């Protein structure tokens, strides 16, 4: 069906735009949707030749739909519809004339909506092509930032260990300083006698007390 549509494209371009129906445009929209999915899949799998071929086909379809949209006449306003309908009623054929205009307006609106969907699909395909390298770069940056956070957290743990070791050493030095302070106080209480003599006097006084 896709090849048939591509063969019909040059023939339909020479026809009057009223020959283009909404069903014909919908077929092109369905084909464009499948082409977009194929383009994304081929980009992810690294099939560059297939991706380029699908992109070229999508571009041709979108250019054809854009040409149809540009050649479509603008729908008449509501005032002109009612005015022409009133004139037709005066002439005796207002009912059928108004109905024909209503149907033509609805068909033009459906065609324009289909063409707007085609243009939005083209923008989506272009955004997918542009965002893919940026998404890969953002993923790499996120990976590097996570590695940096892990290394920094590891350094923080080692620094915390050094702090604990320093505090433990400080407590150890403070404990060793306590006997020195006690021995110094004992020396002052005994009138500056030597450390050995002070211990002997302390033992003798203990024996006398027993």
Curated annotation (Swiss-Prot):
Q: Which UniProt keywords apply?
A: Activator, Transcription, Transcription regulation
What are the Gly residues biased-composition ranges?
182-198
Q: Does the keyword Nucleotide-binding apply?
A: no
User: What did gene disruption experiments reveal?
Assistant: Small and narrow lateral organs, such as leaves, cotyledons, and flowers. Significant defects in the number of cells in both the leaf blade and leaf petiole. Excessive postmitotic cell enlargement in leaves (compensation phenotype). Plant missing GIF1/AN3 and OLI2, OLI5 or OLI7 have a strong compensation phenotype. The double mutant an3 han-30 exhibits severe defects in cotyledon development such as ectopic roots formation at the apical region of the embryo and seedlings, and associated with an abnormal expansion of PLT1 expression from the basal embryonic region to the apical region.
An MF annotation (GO) of this entry: transcription coactivator activity
Which InterPro entries does the UniProt record give? SS18_N (IPR007726)
- Chain segments carrying region Disordered: 135-210
* Tissue-level expression: Strongly expressed in actively growing and developing tissues, such as roots, upper stems, and shoot tips and flower buds. Also expressed in mature flowers. Not expressed in the shoot apical meristem (SAM). Highly accumulated in the proximal part of leaf primordia, in the key proliferative zone at the junction region between the leaf blade and leaf petiole.
Q: Which GO terms describe its biological process?
A: adaxial/abaxial pattern specification; cell division; cotyledon development; leaf development; regulation of gene expression; root meristem growth
A Pfam short name: SSXT
Q: Where is the composition biased (Low complexity)?
A: 135-152
Subunit-structure text: Interacts with GRF1, GRF2, GRF5 and GRF9.
Instruction: Tell me the function of this protein.
Output: Transcription coactivator that plays a role in the regulation of cell expansion in leaf and cotyledons tissues. Component of a network formed by miR396, the GRFs and their interacting factors (GIFs) acting in the regulation of meristem function, at least partially through the control of cell proliferation. Appears to function synergistically with GRF1 as a transcriptional coactivator. Acts together with GRF5 for the development of appropriate leaf size and shape through the promotion and/or maintenance of cell proliferation activity in leaf primordia.
Family under the similarity heading:
Belongs to the SS18 family.
The name of this protein is: GRF1-interacting factor 1
Recorded source organism is Arabidopsis thaliana
| Source species taxonomy | Eukaryota, Viridiplantae, Streptophyta, Embryophyta, Tracheophyta
